Swiss-Prot record:
Cofactor(s) for this UniProt protein: pyridoxal 5'-phosphate
Gene responsible for this protein: gcvPB
Organismal lineage: Archaea, Methanobacteriati, Methanobacteriota, Stenosarchaea group, Halobacteria
Self-association state and partner proteins as the record states: The glycine cleavage system is composed of four proteins: P, T, L and H. In this organism, the P 'protein' is a heterodimer of two subunits.
Protein name in the entry: Probable glycine dehydrogenase (decarboxylating) subunit 2
Annotated spans, Disordered: 1-40
Coiled-coil annotated spans: none
Length: 473
């Protein structure tokens, strides 16, 4: 192993030194003289490796990693479902490999897919108009905040400077509102884990621009008072924003627009399997009611009276939030997923997600203090440290749940198995949970003991990060 780790960066003395780059006849390269010396270098500093060493390096890395193709991934509020390969096939079609700067005439097929995806998402969410431009879920949130800001500026002078966010909301809700220039008002949850109507009434006022909600919330609980909540927000002159993180629990059974939400974003990497991770690209489409459609980003796709598809600028558009029409390959995957499953398939996926969460919860030895829940639940590790539980679960070959959050549950284990796990997998996952629940303190404190990397000193890693192979000893 030590020899292998060394060989990644430089061959041992006497070994071949095969360059990864081909020889170049150009002996000199012009460098911008304005660049400082510490940003220029004489060599590219790539490791010199033979092809077998390089192949083994990446295979070994893949064996040390864990993803949805490795096993269950019950990371709460993340919807880590299996990503079917047919969506990759769709995105790899030659017809999808088009440059966005081509003429509208040459892009009719592309624009047709985008137009239909806008329609699909609008019908799923109960929204009147949808933009596909935002490149990620958080970017979708920020786009929604910009739309709310533009709406209030146009309708009541823009004096509203507060956005209300529940204490159990995703951190991006707080960040998006703050980035939009709003003061964030944190809304305490009730004892049942849901919105406290009295607390909401106290928080609402003439400066309220919006309330951001996830429904079901991060505890997996459906906001049963969503209709009076919507009425209260609207009576105060605010808008109701839907964070689509947990939309997987509602597909085909309920729609945010029907609940009174004015704006929502879709996390296509969660709900529509586009997939997660890898540093992107992503997509965070935003849906709005008809009253807000004129504020959508520029340009938007529509169908002309003659049947052709065209780009147009909404009359009070907030402008661009991303280049061209967003991350096209990701949108193709979302389109393929929705088109393949159809209305009944999406509803079935949602029902199975809720069923799987409830089945798994019923098998666990850990207490689950709040319910009834939908697609996810939050168990309490009790006297155990939730972070230790997570590390110990790695020893049993499964990915741990989200830990320590929401803080409404002590030592929280937020768990979302998704619809793509079988009963056998759920039983194995329950066995892992329960084995950890019965472990002694020593086993928890030492975990993980069966993984390639042992427990990391998180404090030292934060204070002294090693971000390059130059930093290795």
């Amino acid at each position: 192993m030590e020899h292998y780790e060394q060989a990644r960066y430089a061959p041992a003395e006497g070994e071949t030194n095969e360059p990864l780059l081909s020889e170049n006849d150009q002996t000199t390269v012009s460098v911008d003289p304005s660049l400082p010396d510490d940003l220029t270098r004489d060599t590219v500093e790539l490791p010199s490796l033979e092809e077998p060493e390089l192949a083994r390096h990446y295979v070994r890395l893949s064996q040390q990693n864990y993803g949805v193709d490795s096993g269950p991934y019950p990371l709460g509020s993340c919807t880590m479902k299996y990503n079917p390969r047919f969506t990759e096939d769709a995105a790899a079609l030659p017809a999808a490999a088009v440059h966005p700067d081509r003429s509208e005439t040459a892009l009719q097929g592309t624009l047709a897919v985008m137009h239909d995806l806008q329609d699909y998402l609008g019908r799923i969410g109960g929204m009147d108009a949808v933009t596909l431009q935002p490149p990620a879920g958080a970017a979708g949130e920020f786009t929604g905040i910009l739309i709310a800001e533009a709406y209030h500026e146009a309708t009541d002078g823009g004096h509203r400077n507060e956005v209300i966010v529940p204490d159990a909301a995703h951190g991006t809700n707080f960040a998006s509102a703050a980035l939009g220039g709003y003061d964030v008002i944190e809304l305490p949850s009730g004892d049942d884990g849901r919105v406290d109507l009295d607390a909401l009434e106290a928080a609402l006022g003439e400066n309220t621009a919006a309330l951001m909600l996830t429904n079901p919330n991060t505890l997996g609980l459906f906001e049963r008072d969503i209709e009076p909540i919507a009425e209260m927000v609207h009576d105060a002159g605010g808008l109701l924003y839907y964070d689509g993180a947990n939309l997987n629990a509602l597909l085909g059974r309920a729609r945010p627009g029907d609940m009174g939400f004015d704006i929502m974003h879709f996390n296509v990497h969660k709900t529509f399997a586009t997939p997660h991770g890898g540093g992107g690209p992503g997509a965070g489409p935003v849906g709005v009611t008809d009253e807000l459609a004129g504020f959508l980003p520029d340009p938007h796709v529509r169908q002309s009276a003659g049947g052709d598809y065209e780009l147009y600028t909404p009359p009070r558009s907030i402008g661009k939030v991303h280049g061209f029409q967003g991350n096209w390959p990701v949108l193709v995957k979302a389109f393929a997923y929705i088109d393949r499953l159809g209305d009944s398939g999406l509803a079935d996926a949602s029902a199975k997600a809720v069923l799987n969460a409830n089945y798994l919860a019923d098998q666990l030895d850990y207490e689950i203090p709040l319910g009834p829940f939908h697609h996810e639940f939050v168990a309490s590790a009790g006297d155990q440290d939730a972070a230790d539980v997570a590390k110990r679960m790695l020893d049993y070959g499964v990915h741990p749940p989200t830990t320590k959050w929401p803080e409404l549950v002590a030592e929280a284990l937020m768990t979302e198995p998704t619809e793509t796990e079988s009963k056998r997998t759920l039983d194995d996952l329950a066995d892992a949970f329960n084995a950890v629940a019965g472990d002694d303190d020593a086993a928890l404190a030492d975990a993980p003991s069966r993984t390639t990397a042992r427990r990391i000193d998180q404090t030292a890693a934060a204070r002294n990060p090693r971000l390059s192979w130059h930093d290795l000893d």
